[in-house]
Amino acid sequence: FKTIKFDSPSLGKPLPEYLILIKTKNHLARIMHIEPSVKRGDEIHLGDEIGRFINNGYFFFWVDAGMHVEVRDLNDYLRARGGYELMPMFASKITEERPVSELKGTVIDASKRNITVKLNKNNVVKIKDNYSLMDCATSLGYGGVLGKFNPEDEIYFNGIKIGKIDRIGNYMSTFKTEKLKVLVNGIGFRGISFIFGREIAKLLPKRYGKPALKKGDKVNIKLKRQEK
């Protein structure tokens, strides 16, 4: 249907952003953060390559490249808001995840941006008597959980309070995080990022550069609430 190129927030050098619009009947797939290899009028099929991932001024240095996808009406693709809400389908119920005595893991990837760790537990959180999955980068100050909960409900991960519910959607809730210290093998990190439904986390360094850990390292992770 169309591709659009425009400027992203500046990081001291020209960093373009791209908008790819793919038409299907009466709707558009709106895709950002991909430099297109397709052009207007190309026919796209499931599995086709459409471009390459980019990093620009919309990304913190510790964020890996990724794309943003929305489903929009044909004539409503430039506004920041307006995408259709997508409802997730669950294959099974989220069940209790018992706390582990120590949060441990193994480094499976290390880059100048972040360090990926395979954990010894899932990212299941406890909210009162319920259990949910979270998506959260602690350094951003907010996160999300699947399910509708009540404002001010407290969220616990591995027995540690990490935040409170502040907004409720149709199938999810967002929460404000506590101020947390992240220590890994005694090394301080900016934060930790969890991924929905996986025993995977990313350690977010305080600055871009040579990683403090390497692939294969065994780690002990401590999350501590900062004193106010």
Name every feature range the model reports, one short phrase each.
Residues 1-228:
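Contiguous, well-folded functional domains in the mature portion of proteins
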